[in-house]
Amino acid sequence: RQLTGRILDEADILLVFGPEHREWILAGHPESSERVLALGQAGAVLSLLPHGVTIPWWSLAETVLARRPVPRPEDWIDDPYGRGEHAARITAQAITDNLGLLADRVSWDGRAEPSGLSSPPR
């Protein structure tokens, strides 16, 4: 799906692969800065949580930005297009690993408050 202003406005978290994605979003929607995370940035922070500990989805961006406010070069996932099968495998593994951390270490229960602020489940 094409990313639109409406999607950006409605999204609680925006996970991007490359710095060009983050820069493109922030150029047009600077107010989104606290919701835009590199997938690898989120994965790196989540990997540091003790085994069995999860965080609620509504605190993901805040947790990641508190521990790793700026994505590091290793947080970006390279586009493998035109770089061969080996590059595609590396990219697929990075995506799989980071999504696995999101699935294992983030609780996706809860809801957003009408004000747009997120709150824990009651």
Residue ranges, per PLM feature:
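Short polar/charged helix/loop
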Residues: R1-R122
